[in-house]
């Protein structure tokens, strides 16, 4: 009997299909057993069938009818926040672990290199947003060596890589990401901005992270950021620093005012990132989508490893 944990993907659009290709190309602890959609003509479902993976276009009810359903341990949801609430209730009732790629955020915000170890026993984990996956590791890196009073991220993504869901949920993106900057990144106050870049040919994802901190020197911050970038690169090879980390000091004679928090003295750190997609299914400029699917897969692998360990101990 295979030691691998069977997994399913709900959602056969761009995100679900890219995740499917990653799971097939880079197998570790999981075996993809099913892909679920609602459109029988979906390209994602057709690609899954071509690869010998069970499919259904009848949504979660169709998944539950598949012969392997009882053996599935991990389910990825790449649909919508509204649909996820229904899926989550049904899946957890059947003992499945759920990785949520929607904005529903029923489970805890999860950034693999930052706080995955805290959520290995969670039954539902949320992948925040693409901007969150790219930038919160950097905020957390600064927080590990300093007290971060304020963190602001600016995510610039190709307009062509932003589908109707992203466009309809810009406000939700900024709120969710800002909340996770605080809850996961460790900043006392967080702010997020997203820019849809219309440039042609499309530009890869670019992110800027600003932090205002005290209690650490520049070298400690620089080293912590470099270590965190290496951790993210382990599952997103196209994630990299665009240039050297920049620092600016504010002392008693040139205090910086933080809206809502008063005057600040300490170090302003500016980190410039770019994220190039792996090109598994989505084009390489869609680094914003690639980092979501890569982070979801990395999270699923850790959850699956936990299941394998429990089986061995039983």
UniProtKB/Swiss-Prot annotation:
The catalytic site is made up of: 130
- Per the record, the coiled-coil ranges are none
UniProt-listed SMART domains: Semialdhyde_dh
What is the organism field in this record? Rhizorhabdus wittichii (strain DSM 6014 / CCUG 31198 / JCM 15750 / NBRC 105917 / EY 4224 / RW1)
EC number, as in UniProt: 1.2.1.10
Q: Which Gene3D superfamilies match?
A: Dihydrodipicolinate Reductase, domain 2 (3.30.360.10), NAD(P)-binding Rossmann-like Domain (3.40.50.720)
One Pfam entry for this protein is: AcetDehyd-dimer
Annotated protein name in UniProt? Acetaldehyde dehydrogenase 1/2
């Amino acid at each position: 009997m295979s030691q691998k944990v069977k997994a399913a993907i709900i959602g056969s659009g761009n995100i679900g299909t890219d995740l499917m290709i990653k799971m097939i190309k880079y197998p570790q602890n999981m075996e993809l057993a099913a892909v679920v959609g609602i459109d029988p003509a979906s390209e994602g479902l057709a690609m899954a069938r071509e690869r010998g993976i069970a499919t259904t276009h009848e949504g979660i009810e169709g998944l539950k009818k598949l012969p392997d359903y009882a053996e599935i341990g991990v389910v990825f949801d790449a649909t919508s926040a509204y649909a996820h609430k229904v899926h989550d209730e049904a899946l957890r009732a059947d003992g499945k672990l759920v990785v949520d790629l929607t904005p529903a955020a029923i489970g805890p915000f999860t950034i693999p290199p930052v706080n995955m170890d805290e959520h290995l026993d969670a039954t539902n984990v949320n992948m925040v947003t693409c901007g969150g996956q790219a930038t919160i590791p950097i905020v957390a890196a600064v927080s590990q060596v300093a007290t971060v009073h304020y963190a602001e991220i600016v995510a610039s993504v190709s307009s062509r890589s932003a589908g109707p869901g992203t466009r309809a949920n810009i406000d939700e993106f900024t709120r969710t990401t800002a909340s996770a900057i605080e809850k996961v990144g460790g900043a006392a106050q967080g702010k997020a901005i997203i820019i849809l870049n219309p440039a042609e040919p499309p530009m890869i994802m670019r992110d800027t992270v600003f932090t205002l901190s005290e209690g650490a020197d520049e070298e400690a911050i620089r080293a912590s950021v470099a270590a965190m970038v290496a951790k993210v690169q382990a599952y997103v090879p196209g994630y990299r620093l665009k240039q050297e980390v920049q620092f600016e000091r504010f002392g008693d004679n040139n205090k910086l005012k933080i809206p809502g928090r008063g005057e600040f003295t300490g170090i302003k750190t500016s980190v410039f990132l770019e994220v190039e997609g792996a090109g598994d299914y989505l084009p390489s400029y869609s680094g914003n989508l690639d980092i979501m699917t890569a982070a979801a897969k990395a999270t699923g692998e850790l959850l699956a490893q936990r299941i394998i360990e429990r089986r061995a101990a039983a």
